[in-house]
Amino acid sequence: STIALRTMCYSDLISYPWFAPAGIPNGLVTGVSRIGYLRGELGTATEFVDAPLTDGDRIQFALSKINAIPFIDGSGYVIFSQTTSAAVDSELASINIDRGVKYIKRGIRKNSKVFLFKPNDQRTRDQFKAFVDAFLSELVTLRCLFDFATLCDDSNNTSERVAKKELWCDVAIQPITAVEFIYVPITVKKPS
């Protein structure tokens, strides 16, 4: 929806693409005063019906992979989930992880062009690995990744791949997930 796109742009403006565009303040929805639906037939007079979300609606939305936009007292309408259509057990089921992975792929692809047509030897592989490591290290600092590992040597750049004029760099990442639930168990003890 245009609401979600505008909210993602706002979230990127105040943080990074790998921060969840949900919650307060990243998920604040602007320009919306009511949420509901139109009742009536197209081409005839219609009526706007307010449809505030109930807790049951939010549960159903979550099960259907629809991100809820409830009204939060003191803040207004807020996108309050960040589900994608990916499989539930996938890390890519969260918008912030999916966008972080896309940012990484684009950043490496965009900046790797300087390595094209260089000699396909270990020195070039070492330089390429150093570039990828530096890029990913910055993303650790910027709270996109917990950790990463890269491999760019003879084990994944076999003689067959070199003969096909290919350079391979395997990357494994451990992205930082967003807090979606907070639990605060409180224990009351009798005075001693």
Annotate each language-model stretch with its function:
Residues 1-192:
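Structured, hydrophobic secondary-structure cores that serve as assembly/anchoring elements
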